[in-house]
Amino acid sequence: MFREKLKRELQGIKDENLYRKLRNQDDFILNFSTNDYLGLSKNEEVILAYNEGLKDGAGSTGSRLTSGNFKLHEKLEGVISEFKETEKSLVYSSGYAANVGVISALAKKGDLVLSDELNHASIIDGIRLSRADKLIYRHSDVQNLIEILEKNKYYENIIVVTDSVFSMDGDVSPIDKIAKIIDEYNAVLIIDDAHGTGVLGQGKGTLKHFKVKASDNIIQIGTLSKAIGTSGGFVSGIEELIDYLINNSRSFIYSTSLPPAVISASIKSFELVEKERLSKNLEKNIICANKLFKNHGFIKCESITPIYPFVFGEKSIDISKGLINHGIFGVPIRYPTVKKGMERIRISITSKHEKNDFKYLCEKIDKLTI
């Protein structure tokens, strides 16, 4: 009965052309779907640091509150705090766990959470778990956010949460304007800087990009699995926030901590981003890609991030399959992740790509769209 039920549901997914399956990235010559924006996952120094961390064991053996707290964890948290210019930080097992754990711990029943309509699924899930009241404001629409805040300012606790860089379009939230608004309404701002850390603000992230100083009511969440090139998540803010999360954030309390090797590699990655300004090469590639992609008509507006939505509608799946035949990995993004008619190939570039890579991609898409 159970097997048959699953088969029926899977067939329904296939019938709607929404079926997903795993692919091995080693099968491709050119990867345009990676989040490894700075190429740090394959950096020799990062790998050496990872191997050094193995001396403390292959696994962490427990949660941070039991047997899984190492000096390396606390060292990484210090490195992140300095990097993000905050008082303290806390490392989570993933970016998803960080968003879910922070939001569900801070927002309670009777509180109000205002969320951008295009926020990541982990933010949406965190709000659901919190049982707080939720209102959605139009995408990056500051005026709409003000209107909603004005109508609901009687709430004692208000949290505004937004992605910094939106993962499907690569556009950037107007954090500078939102930061001013939350002060006026005595609200808290949670920023998911997953795609901004290592990319914007000379690598420091979105606050630095907008020249907004970290403050008591701004919380920065990030991931180690994108530009940093390892795995895990983190949150940065005031000391009392971190102490509160250690005692109240369920995804932190009840998760096995990250292995020492991952922590060691992450420390090295942050050092490299800080000292070598790795985002410089990425910025050059973004300028190059902007020109080529726009000339070929794949984008209308230039980007300041490495994410490009090539919107082809329903043709996106077939074009993606065609790219695979040419050794190019470009993931098709379909409904319900994006609206119907807005299906796209999400192209992400890295500091390791070269101009000829962009040219090759454009040439093959041109042929596939004739």
Curated annotation (Swiss-Prot):
Binding site for pyridoxal 5'-phosphate: G95, Y96, S167, D192, D193, A194, H195, T223, L224, S225, K226
Pfam families (UniProt xref): Aminotran_1_2
SUPFAM superfamilies documented for this protein: PLP-dependent transferases (SSF53383)
GO biological process: biotin biosynthetic process
Swiss-Prot/TrEMBL catalytic activity: 6-carboxyhexanoyl-[ACP] + L-alanine + H(+) = (8S)-8-amino-7-oxononanoate + holo-[ACP] + CO2
GO MF term list: 8-amino-7-oxononanoate synthase activity; pyridoxal phosphate binding
Superkingdom of the organism of origin: Archaea
Enzyme class: transferase
Pathway info: Cofactor biosynthesis; biotin biosynthesis
Keywords: Biotin biosynthesis, Pyridoxal phosphate, Transferase
Modified positions (N6-(pyridoxal phosphate)lysine) in chain numbering: K226
Cofactor: pyridoxal 5'-phosphate
Keyword Transmembrane (UniProt): no
Binding site for substrate: R20, H120, T337
EC number(s) from the headed UniProt entry: 2.3.1.47
InterPro entries: Aminotrans_II_pyridoxalP_BS, Aminotransferase_I/II_large, AON_synthase_class-II, AONS_Archaea/Proteobacteria, PyrdxlP-dep_Trfase, PyrdxlP-dep_Trfase_major, PyrdxlP-dep_Trfase_small
Family: Belongs to the class-II pyridoxal-phosphate-dependent aminotransferase family. BioF subfamily.
Job description of the protein: Catalyzes the decarboxylative condensation of pimeloyl-[acyl-carrier protein] and L-alanine to produce 8-amino-7-oxononanoate (AON), [acyl-carrier protein], and carbon dioxide.
Oligomer status and interactors: Homodimer.
Protein name: Putative 8-amino-7-oxononanoate synthase
Protein species of origin: Methanococcus vannielii (strain ATCC 35089 / DSM 1224 / JCM 13029 / OCM 148 / SB)
Gene: bioF
